[in-house]
UniProtKB/Swiss-Prot annotation:
GO terms for molecular function: electron transfer activity; metal ion binding; quinone binding. This is Mitochondrial inner membrane protein SHH3. GO terms for cellular component: mitochondrial inner membrane; mitochondrion; respiratory chain complex II (succinate dehydrogenase). It comes from Saccharomyces cerevisiae (strain ATCC 204508 / S288c). It comes from the Eukaryota. It is a multi-pass membrane protein. Disulfide bonds: none annotated.
Length: 196
């Protein structure tokens, strides 16, 4: 049985530290020879002098080179290596719109529930009256516009996801096309809801 040292390189051609690789055939023997990428110091061949200590690990220079190269590499996956795409923004906006719509829904229903439990008997008509009489006009437009456009976008992008689930428009061109349709539909439906 002959032990050899092989230079292992990464996919990108960056040299790695030399690693002890014995030429053996069974996994059991392999376990006796390798421990964490190094020669097992307790193996019989090591103590019988068949493998020299220099075969265990290469010089410290290679290890230092490896450490310095790793420090310079970006953490993977790193956003700076990718070009921004429409799908990123629409995916993020879909999640954000869902969270904001849910928060508005929960605030509304919790308000109705808590006031009913406290004996105030608040109804939808009471909240609607408060909205129109107590809230400033600009605040009404902001609330209604936010709800209208967020709902329109979330609704349209949900349909887009259903189309993808059926296996359609999964190419880059299809993703951009459906994203553009969703944005145009958001403008139309959101403006319609805001005008109501």
């Amino acid at each position: 049985m002959k032990a050899t040292i092989q230079r292992v390189t990464s996919v990108f051609g960056v040299p790695r530290a030399s690693v002890f690789v014995p030429r053996i055939s069974t996994p059991f023997i392999l376990h006796n020879y390798i421990s964490n990428g190094r020669m097992d110091l307790f193996s019989k061949e090591f103590h019988n002098g068949r493998v020299s200590k220099s075969d265990l690990w290469s010089s410290n220079k290679e290890e230092e080179l490896l450490v310095s190269q790793r420090k310079k590499r970006p953490i993977s996956p790193h956003l700076t290596v990718y070009e921004p795409e429409m799908s990123w923004y629409l995916s993020s906006l879909h999640r954000i719109s869902g969270v904001l719509l849910a928060l508005g829904f929960y605030a509304f229903t919790i308000t109705l529930g808590v006031t009913t439990i406290m004996g105030m008997d608040t109804t939808f008509q009471d909240l609607n009256k408060w909205y129109h009489e107590k809230m400033p006009k600009w605040s009404q437009w902001v609330a209604k516009g936010s709800a209208a456009y967020l709902f329109a976008f979330h609704f349209g992008n949900g349909i887009r996801h259903l189309i993808w689930d059926m296996g359609y428009e999964l190419t880059n061109r299809g993703v951009i096309k459906t994203g553009s349709i969703v944005l145009a539909g958001t403008l139309v439906l959101g403006t319609y809801l805001l005008a109501q």
